Amino acid sequence: MVLAKLLIIDFSLPGTISNDLNFKTMNINFSRSAIRLAGAFVATLTFSMIAPASASCQDDKEILGAGSSFDYPLFTKLFSEYNKVTGVQVNYQSVGSGAGISQLTAKTVDFGASDAPMSGKQDSALSGPAIHIPVTAGAVVISYNIPGVTNALNLTPGVLADIFLGTITTWNDARITALNKGVALPATAILIAHRSDGSGTTNIFTTYLAKVSADWNTKVGKGSAVNWPAGLGGKGNEGVAGLIKQTPGAIGYIELAYAIQNSMPFASIQNKSGKFIVPSTASITAAANIPIPADSKVSLTNTDAADGYPISGFSWVVLYKEQNYNGRSQGKAANLVKLVSWMIHSGQQYSNALNYAPLSPAAVKVGDALLKSVTFGGKSIL
């Protein structure tokens, strides 16, 4: 039997909210003999409609990834463009960073995508070493739905932490109004919208809050999944964006591209230098202008950059360093490495238009070095 995975997505702009806020994957079994005898065409939603010439060629040119919803708008564009020039089909499941790493651990996907570096516990669950390749940088923005207010609010680290701790409960609280003079903020109750799944976006946001608020660090901490003091959970950036849009008084955290594509307001956040910074590709780039360690695992939250947006983060493609496993072919392994190399080089040209920051030369250099360490049967692929 052949197992086909179908990724069902909305054909509107990537990240645009539809009635179904969750992406779904279906498993369908096909009989090889039935396909041979009937000569049937099996239609699957991928980034290509071109059928390969042979089964082995098809396997080599089909790559499956899963993970970060933070990356989904960018990945949709990248994988479509890559298919045009190579014929390689990339099927990507926007299931959240945690689920993506779980699927990589189980070896049911070729790569995982995560906005959080793997933890020691996650590393120990792998059957072999994995590498993290930075592929983009983005911003986690604070979006809200305040009746009658479309202004870009100013928020300090302390006020933001206390909102999510549940100690600031209405929009006309004196601490919020003092930062936003001239804005008529209503007495509407604040409702927190947060992620319900394991999330790299959550990791970026809670890492930031743990750095700027001792109360948050003590009571909640940081991670891809935390015990939220208050609020409602949504699955994926799509789900949280939907909760915010549908709920008067709501506030939540989502990736910048989702906010812009869905015309959602978002706050300027005060950074270490005391400046209120609007999240943008320029302010993300400024935050990312820091030394990159050899393993690429670095946080971009609350950096010293004078013009940097303080809730920024890298997103990584994660793959096994040794690619000879589960009967994989060398051709498939080579196509995976070539894909990731293209993403950090030619693929960067698509970042700005989708509100992601292109990688710095330093990040690309580290990514290149890591890709050169990937092997098949102990021999370097590149």
Regions found by a protein language model. Give the residues of each.
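Flexible loop/hinge segments at secondary-structure junctions
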Residues: 55-382
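Intrinsically disordered/low-complexity terminal segments and short unstructured peptides
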Residues: 7-8, 15, 24, 43-45, ...
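Bacterial N-terminal signal peptides
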Residues: 38-49
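N-terminal secretory signal peptides that target proteins for export/translocation
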Residues: 1-34
